[in-house]
Amino acid sequence: MGGWSSPSHWLIILLIVVLLFGAKKIPELAKGLGKGIKTFKDEMNNDDEVAKNTQKIEENKNTTNNTSADASIDKTKKA
């Protein structure tokens, strides 16, 4: 018993979906699902960009803080 990999199982599922939603409604559902997936992927990419920008800002802050600390050490040595 091959689980759900059998073509007859998929045919039965397809038949049930057509009976539940009707042949005209299925393309609309698929279109809505596709738009939802695209929006999700776009937001995931946007989230990655925000994370990269945040990381760059943190690196710049650390570099600035290290430079400021080095400058204050130099001032104390000269004094």
Swiss-Prot record:
HAMAP family: TatA_E
Source species: Campylobacter jejuni subsp. jejuni serotype O:6 (strain 81116 / NCTC 11828)
Taxonomy, superkingdom: Bacteria
Disulfide bond sites: none
Primary site of residence: membrane
Record's keyword terms, sorted: Cell inner membrane, Cell membrane, Membrane, Protein transport, Translocation, Transmembrane, Transmembrane helix, Transport
Region (Disordered): 52-79
Membrane-crossing segments per the record: 1-21
Oligomeric form and interacting partners: The Tat system comprises two distinct complexes: a TatABC complex, containing multiple copies of TatA, TatB and TatC subunits, and a separate TatA complex, containing only TatA subunits. Substrates initially bind to the TatABC complex, which probably triggers association of the separate TatA complex to form the active translocon.
A molecular function GO annotation: protein transmembrane transporter activity
Function, in words: Part of the twin-arginine translocation (Tat) system that transports large folded proteins containing a characteristic twin-arginine motif in their signal peptide across membranes. TatA could form the protein-conducting channel of the Tat system.
Subcellular location: Cell inner membrane
Stored Pfam families: TatA_B_E
Family: Belongs to the TatA/E family.
Bilayer disposition of the protein: Single-pass membrane protein
Compositionally skewed regions (Basic and acidic residues) per UniProt: 52-61
CC per GO annotation: TAT protein transport complex
BP GO terms, sorted: protein transport by the Tat complex
Protein name: Sec-independent protein translocase protein TatA
